[in-house]
């Protein structure tokens, strides 16, 4: 006999993965003092491995974990950090089907976001 909360196929609703998530691609941070935040990342074992060509944005990596530090002065991330302190300003999830996950999120009430991609940048749909 299956518990009342299980599906007939044996799966459990709490374990379903309708968005097809498969981990995190990156977590993006901003801080009023980006130099101090970068130093904290390095003390935690992260290495600065790449910098954006035209913006004050740095990629830190430790193993398979990616942190992005956004120090771009006129960005939403920096304006938010100046008001609220060190903050996570974006999270990128790995998904099996990006289009399907995006459409499902919108169908569930998420709002789409389209940033302003600069030269040589990708315009990636976001929510």
Which residues does each predicted region cover?
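Vicinal oxygen chelate
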Residues: 1-17, 21-32, 61-71, 78-127
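Short, structured motif recognition centered on aromatic/hydrophobic residues
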Residues: 23-28, 41, 46, 60, ...
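Transmitter module of two-component histidine kinases
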Residues: 32-37, 46-49
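Conserved active-site tyrosine of GNAT-family acetyltransferases
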Residues: 37-42, 105
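Short secondary-structure junctions
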Residues: 43-54, 112-118
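Membrane-interface interhelical loops and short amphipathic "cap" helices
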Residues: 49, 74-80
